[in-house]
């Protein structure tokens, strides 16, 4: 068992040091942090200049931004007209999209509980999606 653990450790050490150096990739590229999309904004429209929605679970769109704050895509909210369980559906969608933080004007208790359980941070902001995301990255 100890021998197997040593082999795993050596392989992980090799992958973490040699491969990035040989390929010119940084550790951030290997981990995927910067390349993974990780910020979503509940929005009224599908553009990055859209107003942030005050209806988190029923927002018409979720705008996805990457780890550097660049706009990636807009996703139509499949739960926009859902009668019940919108917060669960939205949380599942955000997890599928590798979202780490959700921004909206306000969050209801059910949405907060679902996001916490999924490990998704949530921030309350108003304004346009692009302005708010840029302000977060300036901090």
Predicted regions and their residues:
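Non-catalytic interface/targeting segments
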Residues: 2-82, 125-139
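Short alpha-helical
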Residues: 47, 109-110
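Compact, charge-rich alpha-helical regulatory domains located at protein termini
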Residues: 72-101, 120
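Short acidic, glycine/proline-enriched helix-loop-strand junctions
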Residues: 62-64, 97, 110-132
């Amino acid at each position: 068992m100890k021998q197997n653990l040593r082999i795993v450790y050596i392989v992980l050490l090799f992958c973490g040091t040699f491969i990035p150096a040989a390929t010119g990739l940084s550790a951030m590229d290997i981990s995927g942090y910067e390349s993974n999309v990780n910020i979503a904004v509940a929005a009224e429209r599908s553009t990055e200049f859209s107003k942030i929605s005050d209806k988190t679970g029923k927002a018409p769109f979720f705008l996805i931004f990457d780890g550097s704050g660049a706009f990636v895509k807009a996703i139509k909210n499949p739960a926009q007209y859902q009668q019940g369980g919108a917060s669960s559906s939205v949380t599942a969608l955000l997890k599928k999209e590798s979202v780490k933080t959700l921004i909206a004007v306000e969050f209801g208790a059910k949405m907060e509980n679902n996001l916490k359980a999924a490990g998704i941070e949530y921030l309350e902001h108003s304004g346009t999606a692009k302005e708010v995301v840029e302000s977060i990255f300036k901090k």
